[in-house]
């Protein structure tokens, strides 16, 4: 309805042609997330891990670990269990619904789950797993839900790509820092989501699954200016 074009295949092909290995990794991981999320935008079958709007994050990391990094399937299963635990804690103590808690509740939790999956699949110590999950969740706090025209397409599809990259970044930091010096615990960040949820609740009708939030508002203004100039 908003004439959105698929970009996953183009992003993947161009990323594979990049001469820098690091950029190829980011580009291909983003493409995996875009591909899965675009399926959700089309109304096709997806895995809600934890939601439809965030359905591109976990599949992107699983695909990257299995098909690119050749991680053993049993390690993936163990990682999925860790991801499920993270998702359960976030749901039990706050929410997974963007309509209730903003996009931090969907992309944020999906990224946190994916970070825990990566760390577990690579046999990281439990503290590193926790730190990775915490970092991924922390850096989505306050993210609003404001889909353009009410469809789970813009900015939702690209946010899945960013959520996947953030998950890998969170694991990279957690696995290389001194784990015991990580200042914020996962539990503290989950509780911080309750504070953010309260702020979003106060502004309900603008930043939580509406067509009156930041992205939709700026889009409408741009269309209005274009109409006036013509």
Predicted region positions:
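Flexible, glycine/charged-enriched surface loops at secondary-structure junctions
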Residues: 1-5, 43-49, 73-75, 93-96, ...
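Accessory "access/gating" subregions that flank catalytic or transport cores
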Residues: 1-88, 95-98, 102, 212
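Buried hydrophobic packing segments
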Residues: 33-36, 57-66, 83-86, 111-122, ...
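Aromatic- and histidine-enriched alpha-helix N-cap/loop-to-helix transition segments
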Residues: 52, 56, 106-109, 162
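Active-site-proximal binding-pocket segments
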Residues: 72-79, 88-135, 145
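Functionally critical mobile loop/hinge segments
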Residues: 111, 118-218, 222-223, 228
